[in-house]
Amino acid sequence: MLLRGQNIVGYTNYADDVVEAFVAMSAKHGMNIFRIFDCVNDPRNMETSIRAAKKAGAQAHGTICYTTSPVHTTQTFVDMGRELADMGADAIVIKDMAGLIPPYVTQELVSALKKDLNIPVWIHTHDTAGLGASTYLSAIDAGVDACDVSISPFANGTGQPDCLRMLALLNG
């Protein structure tokens, strides 16, 4: 389940007890992985959800929203990954919601996260700018543990890279 941290699945902040109850009920009814993010990359807004997922016996994937600006550097993303891992995240996910992360940045970021952390690193991108498959190949070369793909009717464009294309690329 994609969980917006303190916003749960909406666009307003909820009290900790509401977040905890929502996660507990979701886990009770079969959700076993929570991919938890905050739209402004503030780990404080993810802490309650991570703690609640762990308490419910589910996996908590701490998610870094990839963006570009003078303050969004590889080091700031690694620092955030470390903070999420320290909160108990079972994995770190690089979430490139706009499909703009270039392959060379992917290589650098995945390598840095893998070097600094002892938990799996995943990547999620969209093929919006046509970079998805090459971004995933760079991530794989850097040691990423998992990539999100999509079946062909829903793939590419604003979707994730096509699973069949990735399979063909990886099988050489």
Regions found by a protein language model. Give the residues of each.
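Catalytic cores and adjacent flexible loops of soluble metabolic enzymes
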Residues: 1-35, 39-172
